[in-house]
Amino acid sequence: MSGDSVTALPGGSLNWIAVWRRNYIAWKKAALASLLGHLAEPLIYLFGLGAGLGVMVGRVGGVSYTAFLAAGMVATSAMTAATFETIYAAFGRMEGQRTWEAMLYTQLRLGDIVLGEMAWAATKAALAGAGIGVVAAALGYTQWLSLLYALPVIALTGLAFASLGMVVTALAPSYDYFIFYQTLVITPILFLSGAVFPVDQLPIVFQTAARFLPLSHSIDLIRPIMLGHPVVDVCQHVGALCIYIVIPFFLSTALLRRRLLR
C-alpha cells in the first residue's frame, strides 16, 4: 500500500461506485433485518411520544403533534442510519475486516473509499427515512407526493451525517469510543433540533445553538415539505448541509491518511 493510494482526493469521478456496490452486495443478504433495525427507534418515538404527548400537547403550528413529530422522525431516522453505518460498519471494514486495506491495493484511492462509504450511508439513510415516511403517509400524517419531494433532502441529511461520522471513525481508537459520540453529540442534536418539540420553545441559548446543527436545517426543509407548507430559506438550509458534507469529508480523509500510513 503506497502513499499515492492513501490520498485524500478521489482517484476518479466514479471510482466510489465500486465501494458503494461492494457494500450493497454485502448488505442485501441481511437487508430486511438491517432496515427493521433502523426503523425501530424512530417508530418507538413516533408512536410512544405521539400517543402520549400528543394527547396533552394537541396541535403544534396548526397540525397535530403526531404529524409534527413524524416529520422530525423522518430526519432523525436518516441521521441515525447514516451515523451507524459510518461509525460501526465502516470502522469494522477498516479495522476488523481490513476491507479498506485490500481496496487500496487496487486502483482505488482513500478518497474513493471515503466517498463510497458516505454514498452508501446516505443510501441507507434515504431508505430508513423513507420507511418512516411511508408509515406516516399510510397513517395520513403526510401526502405520498410530499414524501417523494422530501427524498432528496433525506439523502442530503444522510450525506451530512455520514461525512461527520467518517471524522469520528478516523479518530476513534476502538468501537468503545463511539458511545461517547452517540451520547454526547447525536442525542443532544436530536432534542435540540426541533425533531421532538419546536425549537422556539427552548431557552434562547439553545435556540441559537440549534441554528448551527445539521439536523435543524434538515428538519426545516423536510417538515414543511411533508406538511404541505411553504419552505423558506431553502438556499441557506441546503448550503449549511453542503458545508457539513464537504468540510468533514476532507478532514476525515486527511485524518484517515495519517492513521493508515502509521
UniProtKB/Swiss-Prot annotation:
InterPro entries: ABC2_TM, ABC2_TM_bact-type, ABC_2_transport, ABC_transptNodJ, Nod_factor_ABC_transporter. The lineage of its organism: Bacteria, Pseudomonadati, Pseudomonadota, Alphaproteobacteria, Hyphomicrobiales. Pfam families: ABC2_membrane. It is a multi-pass membrane protein. Residues 33-259 form the ABC transmembrane type-2 domain. Its main location: membrane. This is Nodulation protein J. The keyword 4Fe-4S does not apply. GO terms for biological process: oligosaccharide transport.
